[in-house]
Each structure stands twice: as C-alpha cells, then as structure tokens.
C-alpha cells in the first residue's frame, strides 16, 4: 500500500479551509492510500492545516476492515517518525517503509511512489476536483469517491 497527500486550493464558496504552510496553499488536503495498481483503498479529506501523518491515520481508521491483508505501507519523507509507524502498526498491523528523496535536488522518479502520484493525476482529470468548491469536507470526500468509481467503471 502506498500513502500520500495532495493539497488543493479552495474557491470562495468553500466553508472549511486551512493553510498548508509547506506548500503555501489555503484549502484542503486529500489523503489517499492506494494499492500497487493505483486503486484507492482508504481516502480522507481534511483541512490543509492537518499534517500528512494525522490525515493518513484518519484515512486508515475509516477503512481498517478492508486493510487486513496489508503487510507494508510505502510513504515519502513527510511521514517519518516513530509515532506514525506505531499508529500504522496499531491500526492495520503493517510496517512503514519511508522512501527518501535524492539529495542531489535533481528530478528522479521515486520507485513505486509514482503509483500514488498517478492516482492523483487521474483525479485531476475531473474538472470539478481541480479546486475545492464544496462547502463541506464530506461532500469533497464523496466527489473523490465518485471520481474513482467513474474510473473503475470505465476500466471494467
């Protein structure tokens, strides 16, 4: 399983928003846990001021019954720390593997991390998800679910 978060800007009509100081985005964050095919197994939408670690744990909490067979979770450098690893172990009994970025500051495709980035790119094909125009976080979450359902229906 591969976990990542995406910050999305808000429109003026959105009620719930936070500020992600790392990416300088005022809006929401989408936390997604995908399998090796890029299909989502856990999704959470939070305000942007929620850390990646807390949002990922919230996503895993929502779908813990479906994640019984997961053995390891691949994450990027934003998820380092023993409390996150302990939280994953407690929730789904899986180990955490942190994929470190290249220190040379050159663009390098991180192994197996591109899968979750591709899933975010699939979401960006839905024009409604380019920005968060929903008033409630739950509505944004349901729009992400609908986008992935549309993708799955087209593939079958």
Where are these regions (language model features)?
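Polybasic low-complexity intrinsically disordered regions
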Residues: 1-93, 97, 101, 147-148
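Basic, amphipathic alpha-helical segments enriched in Lys/Arg and hydrophobic/aromatic residues
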Residues: 86-87, 91-93, 106-156
